[in-house]
Design a protein with these regions (language model features):
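Extracytoplasmic "Venus flytrap"
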Residues: 39, 45-70, 87-91, 189-191
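A bilobed periplasmic-binding-protein/Venus flytrap-type ligand-binding module shared by bacterial periplasmic
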Residues: 156-166, 260-273
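Short helices/loops that flank or line small-molecule/ion binding pockets
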Residues: 70, 74-75, 93-104, 120-122, ...
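Ligand-binding "clamshell"
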Residues: 118-147, 227-229, 241-254
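Bacterial signal peptide processing site
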Residues: 24-27
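A conserved helix-loop-strand patch within extracytoplasmic ligand-binding domains
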Residues: 127-184, 284-288
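C-terminal motif of bacterial Sec signal peptides marking the signal peptidase cleavage site
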Residues: 19-22
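Ligand-binding pocket segment of bilobal, Venus flytrap-like solute-binding proteins
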Residues: 183-252
Length: 341
């Protein structure tokens, strides 16, 4: 009887020990699994996060450049990047080497003009955007690439007052054929530039009565056109004066002027999938018409480019209404375009 009770007690103790060991082992396994899961979460998050460092945005020295550069800066800042603004650096001869050397990371460019800058003025740029972009890509130095071109193009154009355009029935450059009594006004170098007077003569067969040396779509051209001192003025196709004066810009129906789509030129070492998506988003919102209106707000109405850029991006739904604009690093000193110069 005593042995029987002792045997049952030993069995009970053995079962209890085994049960405790099983529970303890289960707890360790659960703890290890929890630790493993906890440890894997930061790694997964790290893989999904994009590294957002500093990006330097540069521009040449006219307002449209600063306007678009500021749009690039704002969308990158909104996504969490640290942005340094280096605006109004000078001409393309200064800005593009800065991009190539890594002093800046992004700058707005113009397809045809950049192609001719890089190929030494070989005359390869055409009116076709894709063709010109393809040729430009072949000329780009290592480490620099072009993102998606915008629809907006800033290039040489011929403008008339509403009254003169109606009188001539002109909507295209070809409509000026046979009008040999017209006076053309433009920059002093126009008679020597292949995309200016010689180009209109050779491509369209135009014959002007005379040429007045003024400026490149600036105040002298504006005054002369509005006063009737000239009949046709050489302008840039996105300048604000077009909207302010309600000029008629003639369609370049024979494609004399090369494609000059506003396009981000970017150093490849900052691209991470997100940067190009953000900058391409800006490009997709830009058209020649809305850039004219934005330039008018700056050049004619006197608004600050940073404010205009932020307002536009908010209206397009690219930035939230509360996103602010940081001040530019340099004051504006030149409001004339160089895209087609």
């Amino acid at each position: 009887m005593e042995k029987s009770r002792l045997g049952r007690l030993l069995v009970l103790l053995t079962s209890l020990v085994l049960l405790l060991a099983a529970c303890s082992g289960g707890d360790d396994s659960s703890g290890a699994a929890s630790e493993a899961a906890a440890g894997s979460e930061p790694a997964a998050e790290a893989e999904s996060e994009v590294e957002r460092g500093e990006v330097v945005i540069g521009s040449t020295n006219f307002t449209e450049q600063e306007l678009v550069a500021e749009m690039y800066a704002l969308v990158l800042e909104d996504a969490g990047y640290t942005v340094e603004r280096s605006y109004q650096l000078g001409s393309r001869e200064v800005v593009f080497p800065a991009l190539q050397s890594g002093q800046i990371d992004v700058t707005p460019e113009y397809l045809g003009t950049l192609l001719e800058f890089l190929n030494g003025g070989a005359g390869e740029a055409t009116a076709d955007t894709d063709e010109t972009l393809g040729l430009l890509t072949e000329q780009l130095p290592d480490g620099v690439t072009m993102l998606e071109p915008s629809e907006a193009q800033d290039k040489n154009a011929l403008a008339l007052t509403q009254e003169k355009a109606t009188e001539l029935g002109a909507t295209t450059v070809s409509d000026l054929q046979g009008q040999s009594d017209l006076v053309l006004g433009g920059p002093p170098e126009c008679p020597q530039r292949p995309l200016c007077l010689p180009g209109y003569e050779d491509t369209y067969g135009l014959e002007f009565a005379s040429f007045q040396a003024l400026d490149a779509g600036g105040p002298l051209t504006t005054e002369a056109l509005n006063n009737g001192d000239i009949d046709v003025g050489l302008v840039f196709s996105t300048q604000g004066a077009i909207a302010a004066n309600e000029w008629v810009v003639l369609e370049d129906d024979e494609g004399l002027q090369p494609a000059e789509n506003i396009t981000p030129a970017v150093r490849e070492d900052i691209l991470n999938g997100e940067v190009e998506e953000l900058l391409d988003g800006v490009s997709s919102a830009l058209t020649t018409e809305n850039v004219i209106a934005l330039n008018e707000r700056i050049d004619v109405d006197g608004e600050d480019p940073a404010d205009v850029a932020a307002d536009f991006l908010a209206q397009e739904g690219i930035l939230g209404e509360g996103s602010g604009a940081a001040p530019a690093s340099e004051p504006m000193t030149d409001t004339s375009s160089e895209a087609a110069s």
